[in-house]
Amino acid sequence: MSITLSDTAAARVNAFLANRGKGFGLRLGVRTSGCSGMAYVLEFVDAPQPEDTVFEDKGVKVVVDGKSLQFLNGTQLDFVKEGLNEGFKFTNPNVKDECGCGESFNV
């Protein structure tokens, strides 16, 4: 099982955590949403829960809850700039289909 980050994503998460002034790491999860069924959730976490799995890559701790882990195993998190837009991009080998707008996915 693994979750990895690009150098750019790791630098961005570390910058956000430094600005925040505290935090254990980044929580990555999924929730029911959108036309394809699931959407990614990113939030800062101050402490993992007992049922969480913690991955560390490039100095960043990524916390994943047990239910989300089956859908996120092998995912790489990147941070990209496309024109005027910038944000996190997920490369998830478990995704079978995505909605046209790219906001949700199906596994």
Curated annotation (Swiss-Prot):
- Does Transmembrane helix count among this protein's keywords? no
Cofactor details (free text): Binds 2 iron ions per dimer. The dimer may bind additional iron ions.
Sorted alphabetically, which keywords does the UniProt record give? Answer: Iron, Metal-binding
Domain of life the protein comes from? Bacteria
Per the record, the GO terms for biological process are:
iron-sulfur cluster assembly
Where do the annotations place Fe cation binding?
A: 35, 99, 101
Cofactor(s), by name: Fe cation
Q: Which Gene3D superfamilies match?
A: HesB-like domain
The protein in question is named Iron-binding protein IscA
Phylogenetic classification of the source organism: Bacteria, Pseudomonadati, Pseudomonadota, Gammaproteobacteria, Enterobacterales
Q: Which gene encodes it?
A: iscA
